[in-house]
Amino acid sequence: MTLSRVHQQVIAFPAAKTDTMSYLPDPASINNHQIPTSSKVSYLTGKGKSMLRKKKTDSFTNGARDQDKLGPKLTETVKRKLSLGAKILQMGGLEKIYKRLFKVCDQEKLFKAYQCYLSTTAGPIAGLLFISSKKIAFCSERSIKVASPQGVLSRVHYKVSIPLCKINGVNQSQNTKKPSQKYLEIVTIDNFDFWFMGFVSYQKAFNCLEKALNNDEQ
């Protein structure tokens, strides 16, 4: 199942707030897509081989095309880094924000959070990618307009949560014609695929994800 189909199946709930920069929305107002944790998979494709693999591609998928759309937005992302840091401190730190946005399991440890973009059918969405010892999770920076089945527009935060045990593969990719354009493609065992791009700290994000998957494997 492609990301476009995933996006179409997300159910929107009316937002309790309209603050377009809040990372602490009412949990009931968040646009959710969560992968259930009913099964376990191995993180090795073969003896001694990590399931995280690198690849280069000349063709553009949905995620690759979205990278081209970013353009000046990448510069804006860097400029927002300092202001985001101040906002996080004001709200009590990443740990507090993470616990407000997502259900946290017992003994779950948050490793890091990284600014990036998630590819959707509506275009790239800016937000934070959280990496913990149990899952990866994304929440959009700004609320987005979504129409209900009745046609009523409301503002919601786009949220994705993927348990590590449901990840089947992670591709570290780049455009050979534009090497600075790098992406992380995450594929679940249910054949959902998620494209993340426009990282302020791309390699650090990949290394953190690799650490999380290796720890979960043990």
Swiss-Prot record:
- Domain GRAM, by residue range, is 96-174
Which Pfam families would you find in this protein's record?
A: GRAM
Similarity section: Belongs to the GEM family.
Extract the PANTHER family matched here.
GEM-LIKE PROTEIN 2 (PTHR31969)
Q: What is this protein called?
A: GEM-like protein 6
